[in-house]
């Protein structure tokens, strides 16, 4: 089997310890693995061909997403599927899809300019974030109208605002790898690598059901989402189509197993995503 990972080149200060291990495990099992860094070199679109059984879209860059879209148009099998990833990367689209699926979330609003949020602040604070983005970049809590200023971190596009929910305890992250669901709780802000790893917690039946709804709504099998528990109720406040899975026990082995099974299904002419277990 031939698998290609579409990746971002991490600086030495931000290593990605899990995915080198995933690649090592796959290669040890006899899989041919290529690492592709779309942001690091030109790609001649005239020469672009589907040369792998499976492409794994790990990178969060716009270049990688567009390249995955071009490969998708040529018939490539991509994990997560390109249409699902594209929806998830747009927080406005993802928020509406999750709401339609009954996923609990704070009330959300879309605006073109920060000042348009002024009337909403009369009812309490808002969490304002760029409609595209990851790793908390550009996200801020706004309490007063004076804080609604133009910010270069917004990326120049529309903004998504969510009603702020006061969290109880630590931040919680839910990860899903196929049908397996994992929970990790962390302090915020996490300053050290150990704090970023957090500690596992047992995922409740309610959170498992929410994870199932998220995956079904967006067509994702590898993803993570942030949960805020406020006044005893869970609220999904963000979702990522292919997170780092930090703090998940044996994450590399779980990922390698799932990616290998996906590639095997493709080579047999079966559907890319596994049917959910019942």
Task: Show where each model-derived region lies.
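Short beta->alpha connector loops
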Residues: 38-41, 59-63, 111-115, 165-167, ...
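Short glycine-rich anion-binding loops that position phosphate/pyrophosphate groups of nucleotides
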Residues: 60-62, 132-133, 242
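Extreme N-terminal starter segment of soluble prokaryotic enzymes
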Residues: 1-6
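A long amphipathic alpha-helix within ATP-dependent nucleotide-binding catalytic cores
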Residues: 191-236, 240, 248-277
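Rossmann-like NAD(P)H-binding beta-loop-alpha module
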Residues: 106-126
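Phosphate-binding site of ATP-dependent enzymes
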Residues: 137-218
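Conserved N-proximal alpha/beta basic substrate-recognition cap immediately N-terminal to
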Residues: 9-107
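Protein kinase-like catalytic core scaffold
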Residues: 126, 160, 182-183, 223, ...
